[in-house]
Design a protein with these regions (language model features):
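C-terminal soluble interaction/assembly domains
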Residues: 56, 71-159
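A small/polar active-site loop signature that marks catalytic segments
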Residues: 1-82, 86-87, 92-100
Length: 159
């Protein structure tokens, strides 16, 4: 915001971050995802910006060993310049495990879909009888999207 101007309206979120993230993960709201991402740049002080948020995110990724496996260009996940390896995303799931209950996915599972033109992803956690809770990443190109769910069900049946 230009110096000297005052905001016309300031919205204060009444829901907790956990509540916002749960709804975000259910509804796949790209706008809210990007707004949450922009807020992490606020930790540097002053106005939030994409540049600040990328700086914070990249520092966090590097400090957790993700520098080579995850690349973020924006916070909604719709940019083709956002890239990840399955191993990198599985590592994120490992760190996110204490918050796995935020996922409310397909068929009542703890998973999240991702869809771009020609790319279908399903990632999350599955409770198994012999291995307990396991994390999984299925990312496929050139399919109708339903294959990722059939693969998950086949994997769950074997675990």
């Amino acid at each position: 915001m230009p110096e000297g101007l005052k905001p016309v309206y300031v919205h204060r979120q009444s829901r907790t971050l956990s509540q916002v993230l749960t709804q975000l993960l259910i509804a796949s709201n790209n706008y809210i995802a990007n707004q949450v991402f922009l807020e992490i740049g606020g930790t540097l002080g002053g106005q939030v910006s994409l540049e600040k948020s990328l700086k914070v995110a990249n520092a966090m990724l590097a400090s957790n060993g993700f520098a080579d496996s995850i690349h973020i260009e924006e916070g909604s996940g719709i940019s083709r310049d956002n890239r990840f390896t399955a191993r990198g995303l599985a590592h994120v799931l490992e760190l996110f495990a204490p918050h796995a209950d935020l996922f409310h996915g397909h068929d009542g599972g703890m998973n999240k879909t991702g869809t771009l033109d020609g790319v279908r992803t399903l990632t999350g956690y599955a409770d198994t009888s012999s291995h307990g809770r396991v994390r999984f990443v299925i990312s496929l190109t050139g399919n109708d999207g339903e294959l990722r769910f059939r693969l998950l069900h086949a994997i769950e049946a074997e675990l």
